[in-house]
């Protein structure tokens, strides 16, 4: 017999109380909190330089340097993020709470490194920039995943109060 009330499936909290305490106590949370907006700022500047090059053909060297810098910042935040996950969740990557974000992060890293490979392989400038734009598109999706998780963590914290 059908029920008139919906039964809500139990949802796993993003952090257990122990994980939340480790998250709040580790310096790696601060490191991530600094690197994430820095990476976004580097992304915005680099995106503008890449689009400028694609539209005008001017500024290849500056656009290239900005993409290499963006790639370096991405790799830095990935390494420090893995350390953060180890401290908070007990494993370097693919903790259940951030599994899909980590999976997609590898796609983002792969595209950024494909750009670096294309750069050193001497591929045509336009091709390099298209790869960078693909990497940046993937980065935006991945950043949105993390912003969503941050929002969920804040809502979870508010519910606990």
Task: Name these PLM-found stretches.
Residues 2-10, 30-54, 60-88, 97-151:
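Hydrophobic cores of alpha-helical transmembrane segments in multi-pass integral membrane proteins
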Residues 16-29:
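Cytosolic juxtamembrane amphipathic/interface segments immediately preceding
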Residues 93-95:
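Interfacial helix-loop-helix linkers and transmembrane-helix boundary segments
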Residues 154-161:
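Short, highly charged, low-complexity non-transmembrane loops/tails of multi-pass membrane proteins
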């Amino acid at each position: 017999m059908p029920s008139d009330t919906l039964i809500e499936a139990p949802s796993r909290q993003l952090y257990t109380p122990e994980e939340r305490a480790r998250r709040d106590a580790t310096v790696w949370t601060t490191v991530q909190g600094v690197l994430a907006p820095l990476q976004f700022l580097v992304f915005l500047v680099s995106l503008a330089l890449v689009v400028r090059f694609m539209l005008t053909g001017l500024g290849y060297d500056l656009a290239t340097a900005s993409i290499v810098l963006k790639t370096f910042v991405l790799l830095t935040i990935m390494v420090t993020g893995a350390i953060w996950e180890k401290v908070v969740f007990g494993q370097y990557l693919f903790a259940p709470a951030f599994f899909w974000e980590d999976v997609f992060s590898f796609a983002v890293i792969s595209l950024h490194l494909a750009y670096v490979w294309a750069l050193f392989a001497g591929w045509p400038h336009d091709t390099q920039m298209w790869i960078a734009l693909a990497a940046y598109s993937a980065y935006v999706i991945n950043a949105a995943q993390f912003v969503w998780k941050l929002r969920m963590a804040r809502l979870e914290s508010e519910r606990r109060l």
